[in-house]
């Protein structure tokens, strides 16, 4: 029995959510999506028994909280980190042919899903054990570590089941995307309208309540135009607000920009149409990879601190290149003045790795010209004036796809870096993720609504 078979067998025996017998209506899907979101938000608000703010140690890492949709010191401490990490690893293993699974068959898809679920559980157990040890290492109560670990394992597995419930058709989209978007929107909303600060989750008083306070008290408004305070590094400012609005408009425009390739179909001879390739061909995948890599390094650096100071120091130095500004430095344009060298290193590392991961993702995820050419031929799509030969079509597509892959990776990396430098609300990566996920949900809602209005379309699209 191979590694994949072992994981798949393990996944089959885990508690699971069954698919609905009949396809739920859009209203029902929205209801279950809302229920899943409420359950997740409640878990993100319930503190872990036996863990206090004084012995939790990741309160300064806003980036981790956003990428993993986690909430410090709560039942959602791990967030969707194990699910994301296992998914990325499985995609890489299958895409690079290190594990042979035919994802075009129902059996292959099922095997992949079960293996991914089992690997996520392994990560849940490992990370829960590490957190349980670090959170309770100062206590003499031998039962407390076990209690914390059990809480984390159960809560994290419930989050996994919530994601599974939504993906299997009870809800809309995926739980991973939904929880990430909810976490980011919470941060952005709080940065605008929060009336109190929540130090444990890096949530300051919002910009607008602060603006009202400054006006009524007659204080100098220049202080909230640009945050230069090291005592309140997460305090939002006016420049960050303007940058958030401006970059939101830019990202929405780019997400809706397509490059069109002229094609014909074998079924409709003589009729020409186009196949759209999104300008952001790899979407936000590159910045997710870079952020997850940095967050994981930072996480293990913090966990290693209680085991080996030297190992923790090395990992921390590496992780610092992935995040900016450093701890205690204002999250605003002022950070460029305080630490210009760190800003340059961060920009170089983030942009270069975004390009590297973006180009790798094209081959790993089946977005490469060869795979796309084969799919076009199977669908009966041809390029006018060219023979129906996979190699010829592959050569033509390669001119578009690799250029789009490079520039889209470069652009999303640049957007994330510039957004971070300008102090956008929710961080640069968070804003990029929130908008792309929101656009996906908008298109999904429009699709589902159209199918409900015109039932005949269900037969045409095979639903």
UniProtKB/Swiss-Prot annotation:
SUPFAM superfamilies on file: Preprotein translocase SecY subunit (SSF103491)
Membrane topology: Multi-pass membrane protein
Intramembrane segments: 61-68, 69-80, 81-89
Stretches assigned to the Cytoplasmic side: 1-20, 90-110, 168-174, 259-283, 362-404, 442-463
Alphabetic keyword roster: Cell membrane, Membrane, Protein transport, Translocation, Transmembrane, Transmembrane helix, Transport
Source species, domain of life: Archaea
GO annotation, cellular component aspect: plasma membrane
Keyword flag DNA-binding: no
TM helices/strands, residue ranges: 21-47, 61-89, 111-134, 143-167, 175-193, 237-258, 284-305, 342-361, 405-423, 427-441
GO biological process: intracellular protein transmembrane transport; protein targeting
InterPro entries per record: SecY (IPR026593), SecY/SEC61-alpha (IPR002208), SecY_CS (IPR030659), SecY_dom_sf (IPR023201), Translocon_Sec61/SecY_plug_dom (IPR019561)
Extracellular-side positions: 48-60, 135-142, 194-236, 306-341, 424-426
Subcellular location: Cell membrane
Pfam family membership, one: SecY
Function: The central subunit of the protein translocation channel SecYEG. Consists of two halves formed by TMs 1-5 and 6-10. These two domains form a lateral gate at the front which open onto the bilayer between TMs 2 and 7, and are clamped together by SecE at the back. The channel is closed by both a pore ring composed of hydrophobic SecY resides and a short helix (helix 2A) on the extracellular side of the membrane which forms a plug. The plug probably moves laterally to allow the channel to open. The ring and the pore may move independently.
Family to which this protein belongs: Belongs to the SecY/SEC61-alpha family.
Subunit note: Component of the Sec protein translocase complex. Heterotrimer consisting of alpha (SecY), beta (SecG) and gamma (SecE) subunits. The heterotrimers can form oligomers, although 1 heterotrimer is thought to be able to translocate proteins. Interacts with the ribosome. May interact with SecDF, and other proteins may be involved.
Protein name per UniProt: Protein translocase subunit SecY
Organism whose genome encodes this protein: Sulfolobus acidocaldarius (strain ATCC 33909 / DSM 639 / JCM 8929 / NBRC 15157 / NCIMB 11770)
Underlying gene: secY
